[in-house]
Amino acid sequence: MSGLGIMVLTLLLLVSMATSHQDGGGKQATQRDAINVRRRRSITRREVVTEECEEYCKEQNKTCCGLTNGRPRCVGVCFG
């Protein structure tokens, strides 16, 4: 293979590596944004929790994450 052919293949390889690396950064940013949204939702939802719900879930050694269909939703950890 000629020197020019090797240079072209090397350039294509470098370009593909650079673009895949940029895509990975975009995915990380998207995941980070999704985590931030979940955190905000769980904080907002915690404000709606009533004392009755907290007491009911405390008996089960769980955390009250709000009401679902009028009934307390008790889980180990609240996620948005």
From Swiss-Prot:
This is Conotoxin VnMSGL-0123. Transmembrane segments: none annotated. It comes from Conus ventricosus (Mediterranean cone). Expressed by the venom duct. InterPro entries: Conotoxin. GO terms for molecular function: ion channel inhibitor activity; toxin activity. Keywords: Amidation, Cleavage on pair of basic residues, Disulfide bond, Knottin, Neurotoxin, Secreted, Signal, Toxin. Residues 1-20 form the signal peptide. It comes from the Eukaryota. Disulfide bonds join 53-65, 57-74, 64-78. Belongs to the conotoxin O3 superfamily. GO terms for cellular component: extracellular region.
